[in-house]
């Protein structure tokens, strides 16, 4: 069955895997999902990811990150901009949770965080927030 909102599907798979305490989760491949995964690795929310190509279809295998006590590194991950209600923000992006969390944006500079957007003076579509 085709997925209408691929980013919401990506977020849901990560959230469900974290709650189930799975070490890895597989997500269908897209360039956007790969770029988001690179950003989440750089910011320390996931351990690593690997793009795996098979004869049927490529997918991304994400290695989730947990604390020493077994708590997921991602406490909250929520979609902001949805297909029915797109949310755009100018260059004056506010901090999420006073800087403890991040907004992930799709901008003219690519997939970036709210902090990077403020530094570069660009805005964009707020894809999701993560804490």
From Swiss-Prot:
UniProt entry tagged with the keyword rRNA-binding: yes
GO cellular component, one term: ribonucleoprotein complex
Pfam families reported for this sequence: Ribosomal_S8
The keyword Transferase is assigned to this record: no
GO BP, sorted A to Z: translation
GO molecular function: rRNA binding; structural constituent of ribosome
Keywords: Ribonucleoprotein, Ribosomal protein, RNA-binding, rRNA-binding
Ranges in a coiled coil: none
Function: One of the primary rRNA binding proteins, it binds directly to 16S rRNA central domain where it helps coordinate assembly of the platform of the 30S subunit.
UniProt record similarity statement: Belongs to the universal ribosomal protein uS8 family.
Record HAMAP family: Ribosomal_uS8_B
Oligomer status and interactors: Part of the 30S ribosomal subunit. Contacts proteins S5 and S12.
Protein name: Small ribosomal subunit protein uS8
Organism: Chlorobium limicola (strain DSM 245 / NBRC 103803 / 6330)
């Amino acid at each position: 069955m085709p997925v209408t909102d691929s980013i919401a599907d990506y977020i849901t798979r990560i959230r469900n895997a974290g709650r189930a305490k799975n070490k890895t989760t597989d997500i269908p491949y897209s360039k956007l999902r790969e770029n988001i995964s690179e950003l989440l690795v750089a910011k320390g929310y996931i351990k690593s990811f690997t793009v795996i190509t098979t004869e049927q279809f490529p997918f991304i295998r994400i290695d989730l990150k947990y604390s020493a006590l077994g708590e997921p590194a991602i406490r909250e991950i929520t979609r902001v901009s949805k297909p029915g209600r797109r949310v755009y923000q100018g260059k004056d992006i506010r901090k999420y949770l006073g800087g403890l969390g991040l907004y992930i944006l799709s901008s003219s500079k690519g997939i970036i965080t709210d902090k990077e957007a403020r530094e570069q003076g660009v805005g964009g579509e707020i894809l999701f927030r993560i804490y």
